[in-house]
Amino acid sequence: LHSTSRRQRQMCIRDSFLSFSFCNLCTENRACESLFFVFLILIVYLRKESRSGMMNENVLAKLKILAESAKYDVSCSSSGTVRSNKPGTLGNTVGGWGICHSFAEDGRCISLLKVMLTNYCIYDCAYCVNRRSNDLPRATFSVSELVELTMEFYRRNYIEGLFLSSGVVRNPDYTMERLVRVAKDLRQVYRFNGYIHLKSIPGASRELVNEAGLYADRLSVNVEIPKEENLKLLAPEKDHKSVFAPMKYIQQGVLESKEERQKFRHAPRFAPAGQSTQVIVGATSESDKDILFLSSALYGRPTMKRVYYSGYVSVNTYDKRLPALKQPPLVRENRLYQADWLLRFYQFKVDEIVDDSYPDLDLEIDPKLSWALRHPEQFPVDINKADYEMLLRVPGVGVKSAKLIVASRRFSRLGFYELKKIGVVMKKAQYFITCKELPLQMQTVNELSPQRVRSLLLPKPKKKVDERQLLLDFGE
């Protein structure tokens, strides 16, 4: 039966009943009585399959709506947790597994089912597509529907984990309890051992957040708007207290779990991949300084792993409280990520990147180059003598390159070509370093000027093709 289509199975059962009716005319034919029970089983199977097909179509219709509603949440990288396969469980994550595509810390592209439990919401946040006053298709998954959908997608190798968020229905605790039930059923009923990222609902109770951390690899609460006065302007029903309280619960849970596991080897882990958050860029008047100072404060907490920056998308153009943007500020978003990288991996302090006299990042050049051009007195740096911290501040030198420089110069002095082989971007670095065997034409930032170096490193404008020029296409 499994090898044929539903239509073929229906025809098969119809023909079988015709045969059975003919045989039943003979009351002495006892074999027909046993066939009758076989046919009953076939009918039950077909009806069950028919109901299952209807349910699947219904679930897929909900999935189309709720996946579309979830696409504006960017905080779905699943880096930072390891779950190895165990007997009796299904699935695993390897080295931080982050149907959306995300990237793990080692650069691998991974797949997550990124979906909302419901896009109904009691709040009317101006920046949100799912706000209460918007007229859009709405849907809600039951807990069992979402759990079964996740397992079906996982078995078919569509996904490697789940990223689950939700609109707020009734109250934060009611919504959070349903999110927890999804994760709990996946772990305990289906023995799912893949990656799970849950959004913690602002205002949810400590007990529910603590329970969520026992089943999820990562928890996140979105700050959204850095300044509370602007948050109140766009989302009057929210405040920062309701956001930072769950963050505190998550932090306490992670630290307590870490302490318990030092004493008891098999103590349960709590959100082993820590927590993350998201900030909307461009919806309000905050400067890059406001955003980065908030990020720096959040990174000061031991369990905050990532702050994500989401360029504001004009989804509610009718609301006059919002800026009229033709497209998201993607360049600004990219510069914030680069500055965030400097805070996390390059040992920069936030007031070195932005301050009162320089509140916004330069959109034409990256933040590291911008800092170097504002501090020419720090350069040139002797590659063969500078310490690791100073090497990290040289434009064109990354974390990996700096480590290789420190390791390689123990054996011999490094020159221009050795640095190029190591991976240093000499197009940038040449203006900020001295080393062995420099080409004669190379000049440092002090010999030229910061303005001259900036003009040399700015990308050249693309030449426009004259519309009157004849273009010949010779094919391949």
Q: Predicted segments — roles?
A:
Residues 1-16:
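Single conserved hydrophobic/aromatic residue that forms the stacking wall/gate
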Residues 14, 24-120, 425, 433, ...:
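Flexible, acidic/Gly-rich N-terminal and inter-domain linker regions that tether
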Residues 24, 115-144:
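Canonical Radical SAM [4Fe-4S] cluster-binding loop centered on the CxxxCxxC motif
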Residues 131-146, 153-179, 185-206, 213-264, ...:
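Core AdoMet radical
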Residues 173, 226-235, 260-286, 305-330, ...:
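Flexible glycine/acidic-rich beta-alpha junction loops that bind and position SAM and/or redox cofactors
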Residues 205-214, 285-298:
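Catalytic cores of alpha/beta
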Residues 322-392, 428-452, 456-457, 471:
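Long, highly charged, low-complexity intrinsically disordered interaction regions
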